[in-house]
């Protein structure tokens, strides 16, 4: 199973019962988090190789230095969201779920990835990111540069999430 980055309401991305509880927790702790139901379609990336997230985190840390991207580096590619509100990286306990739900700020993620992109001489605009992502749709290249594929899709998703004021979901 790979990783798909998503932007949308909680009820479009998560199981219904969990989504209801999470929306209530987010509304109480982070007004304006954008997880409530909406009519907009969910934006989602193509399925990415699971190894790309960790490879990108390693590359970001190598290029920017230790501690330079705390929001991006705080999130495992498992169970969390970048929220369109000011917050520090952390975890929430949601209902009776044993797995803590990771959160970080969408604006900080976007800034960190754009700074990384500039430092690594990669595109940071939607058009350039789309071209970079499209390059890897070729069957001969689909297993190459998992970190770059992940970078393009995460930053594209972050730009969409910022525009919509919705969370960027990192959910297995």
Annotate the PLM regions.
Residues 1-164, 171-172:
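Acidic (Asp/Glu-rich) sequence patches and key acidic residues
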